[in-house]
From Swiss-Prot:
Provenance organism: Mus musculus (Mouse)
Name of protein: Polyadenylate-binding protein-interacting protein 2
Lineage: Eukaryota, Metazoa, Chordata, Craniata, Vertebrata
Compartments where located: Cytoplasm
UniProt-listed GO biological process terms: memory; negative regulation of translation; negative regulation of translational initiation; regulation of long-term synaptic potentiation; regulation of translation; spermatogenesis; translation
Domain of life from the UniProt record: Eukaryota
Length: 124
């Protein structure tokens, strides 16, 4: 006859699953939870390398901006789109001539009238 205290519905305890003081029985090393510190120097070195790399990239961007300002490659007044008022002012400043000054310009020209027409991207 079976002992009623050993019924099959109660959970059975296996020796491998026994946990004592928050550690499993298999952990013979009491310092196992601190083993991550073993590689702390390597981790710190890697983080320090990443910080140096970020600083280097930041310095490169700063130098590029200073170089751009030094050579005036970007001039907002020149490079940004103009407002409608500025365009209208420029349009009003245009002068329609009677064509006589254009004929004088053509007569004094040093350009070859028999030259081929320039087309961008086409090699001759």
């Amino acid at each position: 006859m079976k002992d009623p205290s050993r019924s099959s519905t109660s959970p059975s305890i296996i020796n491998d699953d026994v946990i004592i003081n928050g550690h499993s029985h298999e952990e013979d090393n009491p310092f196992a939870e601190y083993m991550w510190m073993e590689n702390e120097e390597e981790f710190n070195r890697q983080i320090e390398e990443e910080l140096w790399e970020e600083e280097f990239i930041e310095r490169c961007f700063q130098e590029m901006l200073e170089e751009e300002e030094e050579h005036e490659w970007f001039i907002p007044a020149r490079d940004l789109p103009q407002t409608m008022d500025q365009i209208q002012d420029q349009f009003n400043d245009l002068v329609i001539s009677d064509g006589s000054s254009l004929e004088d310009l053509v007569v004094k020209s040093n350009l070859n009238p028999n030259a081929k027409e320039f087309v961008p991207g086409v090699k001759y």
